[in-house]
Amino acid sequence: LTDRDFTRALWQSATECPVVFPEGVGVCPWMVPGGADIAMATSELMKKYQAAIWAQHGLFASGPDFDITFGLAHTIEKSAEIYVKVLSMGGGLIRQTITDDDLRAIAHDFGVQLNEEFLD
C-alpha cells in the first residue's frame, strides 16, 4: 500500500478529502507499535503530510489545534469507512468515483493545491 494509492482511494470516496488533506496521507508499513522504529518512520512521513496511517494499527494526525486535527482524523476515518462499504457492497469493484478532473475542480474552487504526484 502506497501513499498515492491510499490517498487516491480516500480522495475519490468523499468530496471533502482533497480540501481537508490536499497533500495526501502517508502510509507507514506495519511495525511494532510504540517503538522507536515506528516513531522515526512516522516523523519522516509527517514532514510531507498532516496524517499518517499505521498499517494494521491506526492513524496519526497533527494540526494547529484540537478542532482542526480532530476534523482531519474524522474526515480520513469517514472516507475510509465509505471506501470499505462501497467495496463490500460492490463485490470488490468500485463503480463510481470522483475523477481526477473533478478533484482538480474541487481544489480550484476551494483554493487548495493538490499533490499532483497523486493524480493521473
Question: What are the language-model segments listed below?
Answer:
Residues 1-120:
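Glycine-rich flexible loops
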